[in-house]
Amino acid sequence: MASVFMCGVEDLLFSGSRFVWNLTVSTLRRWYTERLRACHQVLRTWCGLRDVYQMTEGRHCQVHLLDDRRLELLVQPKLLSRELLDLVASHFNLKEKEYFGITFIDDTGQENWLQLDHRVLEHDLPKKPGPTLLHFAVRFYIESISFLKDKNTVELFFLNAKACVHKGQIEVDSETIFKLAALVLQESKGDYTSDENARKDLKTLPVFPTKTLQEHPSLAYCEDRVIEHYLKIKGLTRGQAVVQYMKIVEALPTYGVHYYAVKDKQGLPWWLGISYKGIGQYDLQDKVKPRKLFQWKQLENLYFREKKFAVEVHDPRRISVSRRTFGQSGLFVQTWYANSSLIKSIWVMAISQHQFYLDRKQSKAKIPSARSLDDIAMDLTETGTQRGSKLVTLEAKSQFIMASNGSLISSGSQDSEGMEEQKREKILELKKKEKLLQEKLLQKVEELKKICLREAELTGRMPKEYPLNIGEKPPQVRRRVGTTFKLDDNLLPTEEDPALQELESNFLIQQKLVEAAKKLASEPDLCKTVKKKRKQDYTDAVKRLQEIENSINEYRIRCGKKPSQKAAVVPPEDIIPSESSSLSDTTTYDDPNDSFTLAGQRPSSVPHSPRILPPKSLGIERIHFRKSSINEQFMDTRHSREMLSTHSSPYKTLERRPQGGRSMPTTPVLTRNAYSSSHLEPDSSSQHCRQRSGSLESQSHLLSEMDSDKPFFTLSKSQRSSSTEILDDGSSYTSQSSSEYYCVTPAASPYYTTQTLDTRARGRRRSKKHSVSTSNSGSMPNLAQKDPLRNGVYSKGQDPPPSGYYIAGYPPYAECDLYYSGGYVYENDTEGQYSVNPSYRSSAHYGYDRQRDYSRSFHEDEVDRVPHNPYATLRLPRKAAVKSEHITKNIHKALVAEHLRGWYQRASGQKDQGHSPQTSFDSDRGSQRCLGFAGLQVPCSPSSRASSYSSVSSTNASGNWRTQLTIGLSEYENPVHSPYTSYYGSIYNPLSSPSRQYAETTPLDGTDGSQLEDNLEGSEQRLFWHEDSKPGTLV
């Protein structure tokens, strides 16, 4: 029993194990078969694609041409889009390739254009199996085909317009569609023959867009309307039909516009149209009439970042009256949204269209005139081949155009007949050119022979340049003397009276010498020494002429003849002025635009620096001499000759226009040695450059540190502002210290006078000032000044030098260009910026991180505010900014108090200050308590920016021009290093304001700075800059 049981168990185990084994084997076989089949499919697919991927790299592409031909080629990784365009253009013998481009449809269904400076395979080509489809089309449109030079270009424009109308890219009404279809029939098939043939041709030609067929479901109706127009244009040549077709299409509003589907901030869909005219925003159902149109001249910057495309629009109507004077504030940002790839495509298209717009503006001046449409029609009619009616398809797919290293070879895509005809045409053109060149050459050879013969007659030798044919001998020429010259009859000796004749000839010769000397003496732009010498030569020549005339008269009297009336030249007073006069080289100009630079003035060390005049707002209309008081005039009348030196002054001081109704004291006269901008001539252009002579210290100004509470000014003896001392224009200050050149300016009073530093006084002050300011001595430009706020530690090397190094009206740095040099700034694939019109000066986009802290927007609206980021993508803060109303109010109180204090000091006598030699200020800067300087040190928010401007009158400085307005941060570029201590952080703005070019900064003395601090400390309003704070944030 037990054995039987064990045998059954063994049989069961054996059968079970066998079953499991068979199941495993069958499963493995099934799995192996399936996997083997999959491997076979993979191998079969790989072997099937080996024809396409013959090389390990490359992509099979198919270019659809405008004449319905297809060009197949293998694009290598190194092939540029420009080379591919050249290859395609060679199949049309196209010369004007700048209007065309190659486009493709990406995976999202959006049309993209190949960028010519990129490689073809670097673009986001569709990843679908099979060859990549590319389309050759017109990318840049023009106003009329009359501006096209080549007939092949005109024909391609016609084919492109016909394709765009058929695809619906150009919206056309039904009646216009029927007219265009009739013109296409006339162009391709010729004159009307029968309705049956016309209907048959209309079914094969692409003339009806889908929209027209939807409006008119009856195809017979459309064909009948086309036939009606077809009968009217019977007899029209092919060229005339093409020209009429293009005239109709060019008049359509949607012609030449590239449309993109975008959304605004509210999520509403729009069409964004970009063309050579600008950027337009269209309704989704209406592509004809734009809701908004921004021309290129209105735009300033184009930005894109990820899914946002933004443009900065310059709208003068948005500039308020109060802001028109102070800066560029008529900017608002228009933004649209779409997917990232589409946004980048829009940005690239906008850049290319703007570049084409600029190129068109420049090329219009070069093109003499547009071609006549009749001539274009004749050229198109004479063309034997009708490429629009030919459909050529390459069936042999094994033939490719290999273009990897720039070698572009085409095969099998050009008609032999067309090539032969083009060759014949080119040969004829070359023969015509050869004939014209030969005719011109013969004409020039004859002219050269004549010139050589005339030279041989004068010199007696035949020149080597005389053209000779092979075997030809040069002609024999005799030298002819006197044949081309005519002597004066008076110079020829006569037998009547040789002595008198000699005197007469000497008189004529001397008269010619006098005329020559007069011309030399009256030449402009001469230095004083040369001019004086020439004047003396002219005077001597005139005296010699007068002596000869007297000798002639005496001799005639002795001979019993009447004295002759010779026209002796008398030196006029304008050419030979009195050298003893102190005003010999001065000139009075009635027109403020006249030149301020005279002959005796030394040129500036900067050869290309523009010269500037004082602005018109100053009221300077006449340049003449002015005395500060009646006593000074009286003293000048009595003792002018004792006080004046032998030199004459080439400069004059400027007169300020009197402002009626003011109780302010008279503005002092600008001294001649103040090297201010009044000696310069204005330049209407917007070019700015650094105006300095020698080193950076050559025109700096001395700031004295005083411990007293009141400022003191040194008074000098009375002296005329038109004295005859040699003036220093700053052109030779290259090795002396900056403290050697200054002018003492007393406070304004009835006894106010000015002093000009002469050579002797300059030598005395040079020894005195070495002990006062040692950091400025020498001519090294990199000497740093110590900042009292940093306990004697030198400031950063990047800090700009004081404003004394520059002439007013020029930016502190030449490299701080206010706008880009054209082109676009492209960062990466997700963001970019392009400057459209660099002429607009916006304070927000002059640079990147370097300039971002100094940019502030004047606008309060979120749409109008220009963001600080150069890509215009920073979100505006939703929370309200820190209020600075109380701060601004306290600052204004301090400024008004300072203004009143300065007025009182000018109006009152300066007896206490007049005798104190402790402090002296530069007359160019003066003691102007500049209200704008205080505003310069205060960080202004956008809300308080406009209120920081303060209207003041002229100050007591003789070198100060401003009489109307002093402005804060936007007007004063760079504060002078002042010795006072303040709670304001030092802010430096390297960008000059575009609206005011003649503003200057003025240092505050220690007293004024401390008083301003006290006023602010009383209200417990202190502003500090946090190191980690963002621009425009008050901490």
From Swiss-Prot:
Residues 571-590, 941-958 have a biased composition (Low complexity). Residues 414-451, 535-559 form a coiled coil. Isoform 1 is expressed in the brain. Isoform 2 is expressed in the lung (at protein level). Pfam families: CUPID, FERM_C, FERM_M, FERM_N. The modification Phosphoserine is found at residues 372, 609, 698, 916. Residues 635-644, 1019-1035 have a biased composition (Basic and acidic residues). Residues 563-615, 631-699, 713-738, 754-798, 906-926, 939-958, 994-1035 are annotated as: Disordered. Residues 59-361 form the FERM domain. It comes from the Eukaryota. One of its GO terms (cellular component) is cytoskeleton. Residues 542-972 are annotated as: Necessary for adherens junction and tight junction localization. There is a cross-link at residues 883, 1030 (Glycyl lysine isopeptide (Lys-Gly) (interchain with G-Cter in SUMO2)). GO terms for biological process: establishment of epithelial cell polarity. Keywords: Cell junction, Coiled coil, Cytoplasm, Cytoskeleton, Isopeptide bond, Phosphoprotein, Tight junction, Ubl conjugation. Residues 762-771 have a biased composition (Basic residues). The keyword Metal-binding does not apply. Residues 594-607, 664-699, 715-725, 772-782, 907-921 have a biased composition (Polar residues). InterPro entries: Band_41_domain (IPR019749), CUPID (IPR021774), FERM/acyl-CoA-bd_prot_sf (IPR014352), FERM_2 (IPR035963), FERM_central (IPR019748), FERM_CS (IPR019747), FERM_domain (IPR000299), FERM_N (IPR018979). Disulfide bonds: none annotated. Interacts with CYTH3. Interacts with PARD3. Interacts with CYTH1. Member of GRP1 signaling complexes that are acutely recruited to plasma membrane ruffles in response to insulin receptor signaling. May function as a scaffolding protein that regulates epithelial cell polarity by connecting ARF6 activation with the PAR3 complex. Plays a redundant role with FRMD4A in epithelial polarization. This is FERM domain-containing protein 4B.
